Amino acid sequence: MIVESVELKDFRNYEFLDMNFNEHVNIIYGDNAQGKTNILESIYMCSTSKSHRGSKDREIVRFGEDESHIKLNVLKHGMKYRIDMHLKKNKTKGIAVNGIPIKKAVELFGIINIVFFSPEDLNIIKNGPSERRRFMDMELSQLDKIYLSNLVNYNKVLNQRNKLLKDIAFSPSEQLMQTLDIWDMQLVKYGSLIIKGRKSFIEKINTIISDIHSRLTGGIENIKVCYVPDVDVNDFEEEVRNSRQKDIKYKVTGKGPHKDDLIFLINDNDVRKYGSQGQQRTAALSLKLSEIELVKLVIKDTPVLLLDDVLSELDSNRQNFLINSIGDIQTIVTCTGLEEFINNRMNINKIFKVTDGHVVNEN
């Protein structure tokens, strides 16, 4: 899979940008706050329809303008795809694939598979459960459209059930309680499918990550990712029924996969609680490299790797390991300088310098 080019108009600090990428290693360098990450953000949005920063569309449109445009050209399995995305300040974004508008943004998932790695990915290890659920959902949604459909349906049911709980709390009635029975059935139906999907995903990650982490640490550490579902699939219906009165009291659904978590164990110790920052970084790197290998297995193609100022966060051994692991993947890297690549003798195929929203091809 190759990102051939990206064209931006009024996107963040870019009035206009047209970039053509090499199929191997592309370096985008420059000082901080010049617009390097904005380029990666535009590519990521064409994969998931959302910013990795969590930004709203109106925050992405260049200051003083009403809309922005992304055009991405991709080569996948010998077929060309053009993704056009219009972001508007006060309207829903418009998306087209090969000139054909798509009705729902979720239809974009799976067309281009992206693995995005930035220093913020350390949050997957050290922050709260929502970061780890988001990781599972974003990766699974790119690989499995059925999972994505179940996730969308579950979130709709969850929102409707929470709204109904508030109505019941303020004005209880038999009719509302009967409606709650219906939403409970839907919650269990879609929630169970999500739990099964996440369980299978983590099992696959574990078959890959153990070897990667062992090699990364010279064999002195072993890693295991433990999926911790909030409820067991077999007990889900009963758990929801038993928590009903509590849910009505607090006006929110207390049981389900929206409460799931992951635990990362290094040598049987929870790295979030007991690991050093170096161990947490290594665990995050192992996880991202495992993502790459899993995508290869599932789609029978390589993903596009976006590295946002990551090498500066790693020591020389981990830099070398990462660089040696991505030789067959198109990689687009942002950084402030070229020293890490020169020191690691990395083959650089294309170099771009960014200065205040202006990009110069230095090849």
Swiss-Prot record:
It comes from the Bacteria. NCBIfam families: recf. This is DNA replication and repair protein RecF. Coiled coil: none annotated. Its main location: cytoplasm. GO terms for biological process: DNA replication; DNA synthesis involved in DNA repair; double-strand break repair; SOS response. Transmembrane segments: none annotated. Keywords: ATP-binding, Cytoplasm, DNA damage, DNA repair, DNA replication, DNA-binding, Nucleotide-binding, SOS response. CDD domains: ABC_RecF. GO terms for cellular component: cytoplasm. GO terms for molecular function: ATP binding; ATP hydrolysis activity; single-stranded DNA binding. The keyword DNA damage applies. Belongs to the RecF family. InterPro entries: DNA-binding_RecF, DNA-binding_RecF_CS, P-loop_NTPase, Rad50/SbcC_AAA, RecF_2. The RecF protein is involved in DNA metabolism; it is required for DNA replication and normal SOS inducibility. RecF binds preferentially to single-stranded, linear DNA. It also seems to bind ATP. The gene is recF. The keyword Hydrolase does not apply. ATP binds at G30, D31, N32, A33, Q34, G35, K36, T37. It comes from Lachnospira eligens (strain ATCC 27750 / DSM 3376 / VPI C15-48 / C15-B4) (Eubacterium eligens). It is found in: Cytoplasm.
